[in-house]
């Protein structure tokens, strides 16, 4: 009885303490969704903020050089200024992806897997085809139905010519 009480007292306290320690393990940084954010979209070509928010010393010097006439900037500096403002160009945004290969491959995988399951079922689950599906059996059954004159007004036997022993045209 005493060990049970000690275990229950220390066990519940240890469990609750470990939960508290686990809960305070990391600090979650919350995003302020009221502030504008950067996004590359074709239908929204000029985002509210620049792509690079924290400029390095070289980028700050380049931004100062940007205030001068643009003819003095080299092509590489113009590209660097563009990359500070935007992550992708329109050509890069419009470039096709290879996602279709993944979709087609996944679809073909599942079609193949389904085919394997059907082949396995046909081989191991289903029995042999009943003898009533044989062409000879179907012919005998049709002859029997014609001999019995099944549905003679508008049905099966109405389409059979009993004098010529052939189907009516």
UniProtKB/Swiss-Prot annotation:
<dbReference type="GO" id="GO:0045277">
    <property type="term" value="C:respiratory chain complex IV"/>
</dbReference>
<keyword id="KW-0496">Mitochondrion</keyword>
<feature type="topological domain" description="Mitochondrial matrix">
    <location>
        <begin position="23"/>
        <end position="98"/>
    </location>
</feature>
<keyword id="KW-0999">Mitochondrion inner membrane</keyword>
<keyword id="KW-0597">Phosphoprotein</keyword>
<protein>
    <recommendedName>
        <fullName>Cytochrome c oxidase subunit 4 isoform 1, mitochondrial</fullName>
    </recommendedName>
</protein>
<feature type="modified residue" description="N6-acetyllysine">
    <location>
        <position position="53"/>
    </location>
</feature>
<feature type="modified residue" description="Phosphoserine">
    <location>
        <position position="56"/>
    </location>
</feature>
<feature type="modified residue" description="N6-acetyllysine">
    <location>
        <position position="67"/>
    </location>
</feature>
<feature type="topological domain" description="Mitochondrial intermembrane">
    <location>
        <begin position="125"/>
        <end position="169"/>
    </location>
</feature>
<dbReference type="InterPro" id="IPR004203">
    <property type="entry name" value="Cyt_c_oxidase_su4_fam"/>
</dbReference>
<keyword id="KW-0472">Membrane</keyword>
<comment type="function">
    <text>Component of the cytochrome c oxidase, the last enzyme in the mitochondrial electron transport chain which drives oxidative phosphorylation. The respiratory chain contains 3 multisubunit complexes succinate dehydrogenase (complex II, CII), ubiquinol-cytochrome c oxidoreductase (cytochrome b-c1 complex, complex III, CIII) and cytochrome c oxidase (complex IV, CIV), that cooperate to transfer electrons derived from NADH and succinate to molecular oxygen, creating an electrochemical gradient over the inner membrane that drives transmembrane transport and the ATP synthase.</text>
</comment>
<feature type="transmembrane region" description="Helical">
    <location>
        <begin position="99"/>
        <end position="124"/>
    </location>
</feature>
<dbReference type="InterPro" id="IPR036639">
    <property type="entry name" value="Cyt_c_oxidase_su4_sf"/>
</dbReference>
<dbReference type="InterPro" id="IPR013288">
    <property type="entry name" value="Cyt_c_oxidase_su4"/>
</dbReference>
<keyword id="KW-0812">Transmembrane</keyword>
<keyword id="KW-1133">Transmembrane helix</keyword>
<dbReference type="Pfam" id="PF02936">
    <property type="entry name" value="COX4"/>
</dbReference>
<feature type="modified residue" description="N6-succinyllysine; alternate">
    <location>
        <position position="29"/>
    </location>
</feature>
<keyword id="KW-0007">Acetylation</keyword>
<dbReference type="GO" id="GO:0005743">
    <property type="term" value="C:mitochondrial inner membrane"/>
</dbReference>
<feature type="transit peptide" description="Mitochondrion">
    <location>
        <begin position="1"/>
        <end position="22"/>
    </location>
</feature>
<comment type="similarity">
    <text>Belongs to the cytochrome c oxidase IV family.</text>
</comment>
<feature type="modified residue" description="N6-acetyllysine; alternate">
    <location>
        <position position="60"/>
    </location>
</feature>
<keyword id="KW-0809">Transit peptide</keyword>
<comment type="pathway">
    <text>Energy metabolism; oxidative phosphorylation.</text>
</comment>
<feature type="modified residue" description="N6-acetyllysine; alternate">
    <location>
        <position position="29"/>
    </location>
</feature>
<dbReference type="GO" id="GO:0006123">
    <property type="term" value="P:mitochondrial electron transport, cytochrome c to oxygen"/>
</dbReference>
<feature type="modified residue" description="N6-succinyllysine; alternate">
    <location>
        <position position="60"/>
    </location>
</feature>
<comment type="subunit">
    <text>Component of the cytochrome c oxidase (complex IV, CIV), a multisubunit enzyme composed of 14 subunits. The complex is composed of a catalytic core of 3 subunits MT-CO1, MT-CO2 and MT-CO3, encoded in the mitochondrial DNA, and 11 supernumerary subunits COX4I, COX5A, COX5B, COX6A, COX6B, COX6C, COX7A, COX7B, COX7C, COX8 and NDUFA4, which are encoded in the nuclear genome.</text>
</comment>
């Amino acid at each position: 009885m005493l060990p049970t009480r000690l275990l229950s007292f220390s066990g519940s306290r240890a469990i609750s303490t470990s939960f508290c320690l686990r809960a305070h393990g990391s600090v979650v940084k919350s995003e302020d969704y009221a502030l504008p954010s950067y996004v590359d979209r074709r239908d929204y070509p000029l985002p509210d903020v620049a792509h690079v928010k924290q400029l390095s010393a070289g980028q700050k010097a380049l931004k100062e050089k940007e205030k001068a006439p643009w003819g003095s900037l080299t092509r590489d500096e113009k590209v660097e200024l563009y990359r500070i403002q935007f992550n992708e160009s329109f050509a890069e945004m419009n470039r096709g992806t290879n996602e279709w290969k993944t979709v087609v491959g996944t679809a073909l995988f599942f079609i193949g897997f389904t085919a394997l399951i059907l082949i396995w079922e046909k081989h191991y689950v289903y029995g042999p085809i009943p003898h009533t599906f044989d062409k000879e059996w179907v012919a005998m059954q049709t002859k029997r139905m014609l001999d019995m004159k099944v549905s003679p007004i508008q049905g099966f036997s109405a389409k059979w010519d009993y004098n010529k022993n052939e189907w009516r045209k």
